[in-house]
Curated annotation (Swiss-Prot):
Residues 817-837 are annotated as: Fusion peptide 2. Residues 14-290 form the BetaCoV S1-NTD domain. Changing S577A: In strain: Isolate Tor2 and Isolate Shanghai QXC1. GO terms for biological process: endocytosis involved in viral entry into host cell; fusion of virus membrane with host endosome membrane; fusion of virus membrane with host plasma membrane; membrane fusion; positive regulation of viral entry into host cell; receptor-mediated virion attachment to host cell; symbiont-mediated suppression of host innate immune response; symbiont-mediated-mediated suppression of host tetherin activity. This is Spike glycoprotein. The cytoplasmic Cys-rich domain is palmitoylated. Spike glycoprotein is digested by cathepsin CTSL within endosomes. The record marks R667, S668, R797, S798 as: Cleavage. The gene is S.
Length: 1255
């Protein structure tokens, strides 16, 4: 199969040949393919290393459709293709078939086109008016493998650009086999430049566009400045013989660029290694929102939908009369400057461009408005003031000027809005002999006010007294100009017209010649009503304006309504639709699946409420599917709604949770997906008396937890001027117009720094000096040496004494200290040192070992000798009995003191509680009075706050008015943008610091609480002081914080028990006094909640309350909407720079409605002072219990004497046995029952009813 060519002329390959036409050419088959991640290019020439970069430009969207064009045999696919915003062009080749392109609009000689071709020896680029061939192509002879013809255009003229590369040699022979080369190009025509990017990748494919990622690099930036709407490829035709032609196999693919945001990933070498199309899907947008390729599990707020206006609405009044400016400028005679005249211009169309473009005026200066924008504006009225001055005085006709003319003749206000036009009239108002008809005032008592006119001609005297010239110090106030045609230009006459514009405080009567458009309602549009410009949705309003009212403002002073100047219809202005979107993800490490929450939108309205047709393509996500779940928070798409409840992995809000689970729990598959469900505390049947299962610890282990809590952060300040402007003087001067913003920022930072110091003081002020910790200087990477005590200091006694003595400390009721001083180290003086206390003889309840030995020896001796001393030996038992009695007395009086102290504590505590309650009542009364006053002013204060906060909106209106009227110097515009952007950055930084400071403040408060509850006490809260049940805690200072070392015991083993909050028995409910009821499978027990210690349920550990009826109530079912922040008032700050602008009409309203009542709570304060006094009197005066310390250990001679005494007693006992009748009982020879029998004591114990348990 071949292609036949008609009228073919063979010439050398180096020449452009005459066009020819193909016969029997078949239309190519167009196929659709996916672009995968093709088409990414370097957006600029800036080196970036190891960073993520967001850029918005024309890109080929990822996984978009590209159209494939194929050439083989007589299928020659190079049609004219639309260019649109730009194209992605990829060619899969093996024989260099694609050789170039033609870009243009009409693609003929009626307009310029640009040709980019590879002619096998050079790359040639030309921009001309071409007579293009119908089928532009290169011809190659198959047998020779050489190029023979170049048939691209017949003629070229009006060439404005040409480029020829260095010479090279291209292999143009036909190849067989698979496609080996993938050449990618991106073309975009922007700002008069044609940008060309190129990439190459070796391939081995049979068909289709291979998937993959390859970054294209810039090769051309062509300054062509031509309109490009179409293009076509230039291919190669292969000729097996003369006059017979065919094509080789090749394919190219075309995709269209769109304005899209891409996130590019640069490696350390500045190479783009990965990219994200932010508009591809919700996950891609989420990655761009958080600027990360890896997303953790959670729900994330992404960008709002940004609606693009669908059109422009321009509405001006129905005025057709032209303004009579000619009557003003072409008047035959002008008045003198002191008697200037004014003409009111209204109800007409003003074409200011005629004045602006005229070369007739030597001076044309506008103030407060740009001359080039006058035709776009409307005014209530325009006033034209006219007069004549000399050339040198024209400069005084301006705001803020001084001089004879400005002070005594014609004065403009400082906030003047209008234009000054002046032109030389020497040919009209000057003569060769002098024209003295024009006068000016040169003397006056006091300066004129703006637009004040004084036409009097009363003689002037410095003292103000009447006089008649030519008397001394008496002058006529007017002087003649005397215009001569021969004088210099500074003394020549100039006619002046001052146009003053009255802003729209009334219906517009003077407008520019701008044509009105149709009114578009219920769509996002750019509007211009009498010069009021903005963007919003226009809807019919129910408001009723007064005839003179043109605009309406809300409570925040934002323009929210307008009168249509053509129809007088009242229209409401609302912002274009913005819909909040959240993305739920299980984390990119788990899955790329996401769900999308369209906030506050019904699922039935998702496609319309967000105005998908008006969304900008640069940043857009929209998801639909079968898994649609309507929630109170909005429409959730992409998550499967299930009734089963899981652990709440991702809280969405409004009672909805999401998790990533295996769906096999619901169906017989192993696929995982995002499931959404309604959070629940249990089924409806799970009422108070239902059985539930709890885990109770049965064994524990000691755990040490380190907890770091920040209480401060690094102090920062900002060199605002250097940060924003660097060394630029111009920027610094412009920054002055922003007032004290920088000072306020640093003031906020200083406040944060002071708060950090306060946090630190408050936390560490609770660390007591008496607190001791073990010698542990380093633990867990933290240094504990700052709070650890020094090594133990030596005690009062020496080491040897501590070795020989034991120390015992007792509570002293008041007699033990005297006893110790009396006793000294002589234990034998025990009874002698007995003390008197409240009429009783007392001894300390303390017996040392040597005292016990002495009294025991006396007792045994008295008992043993009683038989043979006829009872006299029993007297030795008296010391034992006396000291026992005295010691019981000592114990008794000590217990009595303790009891009395406890009684005093209870009484005084109860008294203090009553005083505290009374103080709380008094405080509540005082606060009630305060609340009443505050409530009375609430509405007025709310109104005032809204009016004050609305100033920022009014400022925006002022700026919009100024921007719509003024032309700025480009340099100042750029500097102002820089300042605004960096000020916003600084404000964001300070806001972040304030948020962080709030977090630090909360952390410091929590640290102070833990210092009190964990360090200075033992917390009963589980997991509050470490993990588990708290034992003790140690604090340690750390950088910007405090470290707690919590010692806890944590459950190591647990058992599950069935439990119930109460047990119903015989119609009554029994509740545990402490602990919980558990069921072990056979019986119910009561046990502690934190440790399994079952006890039998008795009336001692339960109490009865109420009946078995269950009352179920909802404590709180309130869902709070997010608060809308009020804008801060910058009125005082900006009044310095924006004064007397009438268009925004900033009005703080009538604040006289505030009730300025004085709160009188003096009685309550006096009562609080009295209560405080009573509380001070509640100090508990306890009887002092001193501490008595005694070191006890028998010395060696006591032991020796004790042993000797025992030996003597034994010997005496043996002697007695030998001397009495009991001697023979030892051998059993006689009865000695009365001597050797042991009596059995069957008496009851003294303490009856007391059972002793030994464990």
């Amino acid at each position: 199969m071949f292609i036949f060519l008609l009228f073919l002329t063979l010439t050398s390959g180096s020449d452009l040949d005459r066009c020819t036409t193909f016969d029997d050419v078949q239309a190519p088959n167009y196929t659709q393919h996916t672009s995968s991640m093709r088409g990414v290019y370097y957006p600029d020439e800036i080196f970036r290393s190891d960073t993520l970069y967001l850029t918005q430009d024309l890109f080929l969207p990822f996984y978009s459709n590209v159209t494939g064009f194929h050439t083989i045999n007589h299928t020659f696919g190079n049609p004219v293709i639309p260019f649109k915003d730009g194209i992605y062009f990829a060619a899969t080749e093996k024989s260099n078939v694609v050789r170039g392109w033609v870009f243009g609009s009409t693609m003929n000689n009626k307009s310029q086109s640009v040709i980019i071709i590879n002619n096998s020896t050079n790359v040639v680029i030309r921009a001309c008016n071409f007579e293009l061939c119908d089928n532009p192509f290169f011809a190659v002879s198959k047998p020779m493998g050489t190029q023979t013809h170049t048939m691209i255009f017949d003629n070229a003229f009006n060439c404005t650009f040409e480029y020829i590369s260095d010479a090279f040699s291209l292999d143009v022979s036909e190849k067989s086999g698979n496609f080996k080369h993938l050449r990618e190009f991106v073309f975009k025509n922007k700002d008069g430049f044609l940008y060309v990017y190129k990439g190459y990748q070796p391939i081995d494919v049979v068909r289709d566009l291979p998937s993959g990622f390859n970054t294209l690099k810039p090769i051309f930036k062509l300054p062509l400045g031509i309109n490009i709407t179409n293009f076509r490829a230039i291919l190669t035709a292969f000729s097996p013989a003369q006059d017979i032609w065919g094509t080789s196999a090749a394919a190219y693919f075309v995709g269209y660029l769109k304005p899209t945001t891409f996130m590019l990933k640069y490696d350390e070498n500045g190479t783009i290694t990965d990219a994200v199309d932010c508009s591809q899907n919700p996950l891609a947008e989420l990655k761009c929102s958080v600027k990360s390729f890896e997303i953790d599990k959670g729900i994330y707020q992404t960008s709002n939908f940004r609606v693009v206006p669908s059109g422009d609405v321009v509405r001006f009044p129905n005025i057709t009369n032209l303004c009579p400016f000619g009557e003003v400028f072409n008047a035959t005679k002008f008045p003198s400057v002191y008697a200037w005249e004014r003409k009111k211009i209204s109800n007409c169309v003003a074409d200011y461009s005629v004045l602006y473009n005229s070369t007739f005026f030597s001076t044309f200066k506008c103030y407060g408005v740009s001359a080039t924008k006058l035709n776009d504006l409307c005014f209530s009225n325009v006033y034209a003031d006219s007069f004549v001055v000399k050339g040198d005085d024209v400069r005084q006709i301006a705001p803020g000027q001084t001089g004879v003319i400005a002070d005594y003749n014609y004065k403009l206000p400082d906030d003047f809005m209008g234009c000054v036009l002046a032109w030389n009239t020497r040919n009209i108002d000057a003569t060769s002999t002098g024209n003295y008809n024009y006068k000016y005032r040169y003397l006056r008592h006091g300066k004129l006010r703006p637009f004040e006119r004084d036409i009097s001609n009363v003689p002037f005297s410095p003292d103000g007294k009447p006089c008649t010239p030519p008397a001394l110090n008496c002058y006529w106030p007017l002087n003649d100009y005397g215009f001569y045609t021969t004088t210099g230009i500074g003394y020549q006459p100039y006619r002046v017209v001052v146009l003053s514009f009255e802003l729209l405080n009334a219906p517009a009567t003077v407008c520019g010649p701008k044509l009105s458009t149709d009114l578009i309602k219920n769509q996002c549009v750019n509007f211009n009503f009498n010069g009021l410009t903005g963007t919003g949705v226009l809807t019919p309003s129910s408001k009723r304006f007064q005839p003179f009212q043109q605009f309406g403002r809300d409570v925040s002073d934002f323009t929210d309504s307008v009168r249509d100047p053509k129809t007088s219809e009242i229209l409401d202005i609302s912002p274009c639709s913005f819909g909040g979107v959240s993305v739920i993800t299980p984390g990119t490490n788990a899955s790329s699946e996401v769900a999308v929450l369209y906030q506050d939108v019904n699922c039935t309205d998702v496609s319309t409420a967000i105005h998908a047709d008006q969304l900008t393509p640069a940043w857009r996500i929209y998801s639909t599917g079968n898994n649609v779940f309507q929630t109170q928070a909005g429409c959730l798409i992409g998550a499967e709604h299930v009734d089963t409840s899981y652990e709440c992995d991702i809280p969405i809000g409004a009672g909805i949770c999401a998790s990533y689970h295996t769906v096999s729990l619901l169906r017989s598959t192993s696929q995982k997906s995002i499931v959404a469900y309604t959070m629940s505390l249990g089924a409806d049947s799970s009422i108070a008396y239902s059985n539930n299962t709890i885990a109770i610890p049965t064994n524990f282990s000691i755990s040490i937890t380190t907890e770091v809590m920040p209480v401060s952060m690094a102090k920062t300040s900002v060199d605002c001027n250097m940060y924003i402007c660097g060394d630029s003087t111009e920027c610094a001067n412009l920054l002055l117009q922003y007032g004290s913003f920088c000072t306020q920022l640093n003031r906020a930072l200083s406040g944060i720094a002071a708060e950090q110091d306060r946090n630190t003081r408050e936390v560490f002020a609770q660390v007591k000096q008496m607190y001791k910790t073990p010698t542990l200087k380093y633990f867990g990477g933290f240094n504990f040496s700052q709070i650890l005590p020094d090594p133990l200091k030596p005690t009062k006694r020496s080491f040897i004494e501590d070795l020989l003595f034991n120390k015992v400390t007792l509570a002293d009721a008041g007699f033990m200290k005297q006893y110790g001083e009396c006793l000294g180290d002589i234990n034998a003086r025990d009874l002698i040192c007995a003390q008197k206390f409240n009429g009783l003889t007392v001894l300390p309840p303390l017996l040392t070992d040597d005292m016990i030995a002495a009294y025991t020896a006396a007792l045994v001796s008295g008992t043993a000798t009683a038989g043979w001393t006829f009872g006299a030996g029993a007297a030795l038992q008296i010391p034992f009995a006396m000291q026992m009695a005295y010691r019981f007395n000592g114990i008794g009086v000590t217990q009595n003191v303790l009891y009395e102290n406890q009684k005093q504590i209870a009484n005084q505590f109860n008294k203090a509680i009553s005083q505290i309650q009374e103080s709380l009542t008094t405080t509540s009364t005082a606060l009630g009075k305060l609340q009443d006053v505050v409530n009375q002013n609430a509405q007025a204060l709310n109104t005032l706050v809204k009016q004050l906060s609305s100033n920022f909106g009014a400022i925006s209106s002022v700026l919009n008015d100024i921007l719509s009227r003024l032309d700025k110097v480009e340099a100042e515009v750029q500097i102002d943008r820089l300042i605004t952007g960096r000020l916003q950055s600084l404000q964001t930084y300070v806001t972040q610091q304030l948020i962080r400071a709030a977090e630090i403040r909360a952390s410091a408060n929590l640290a102070a609480t833990k210092m009190s509850e964990c360090v200075l006490g033992q917390s009963k809260r589980v997991d509050f002081c470490g993990k588990g049940y708290h034992l003790m805690s140690f604090p340690q200072a750390a950088p910007h914080g405090v470290v707690f070392l919590h010692v806890t015991y944590v459950p190591s083993q647990e058992r599950n028990f069935t439990t119930a909050p109460a047990i119903c028995h015989e119609g009554k409910a029994y509740f545990p006094r402490e602990g919980v009821f558990v069921f072990n499978g056979t019986s119910w027990f009561i046990t502690q909640r934190n440790f399994f210690s079952p006890q039998i349920i008795t009336t001692d550990n339960t109490f009865v309350s109420g009946n078995c009826d269950v009352v179920i109530g909802i404590i709180n079912n309130t869902v709070y909407d997010p608060l809308q922040p009020e804008l801060d008032s910058f009125k005082e700050e900006l009044d310095k720079y924006f004064k007397n602008h009438t268009s925004p009409d900033v009005d703080l309203g009538d604040i006289s409605g505030i009730n300025a009542s004085v709160v009188n709570i003096q009685k309550e304060i006096d009562r609080l002072n009295e209560v405080a006094k009573n509380l001070n009197e509640s100090l508990i005066d306890l009887q002092e219990l001193g501490k008595y310390e005694q070191y006890i250990k028998w010395p060696w001679y006591v032991w020796l004497g004790f042993i000797a005494g025992l030996i003597a007693i034994v010997m005496v006992t043996i002697l007695l046995c030998c001397m009495t009748s009991c001697c023979s009982c030892l051998k059993g020879a006689c009865s000695c029952g009365s001597c050797c029998k042991f009596d059995e004591d069957d008496s009851e114990p003294v303490l009856k009813g007391v059972k002793l348990h030994y464990t």
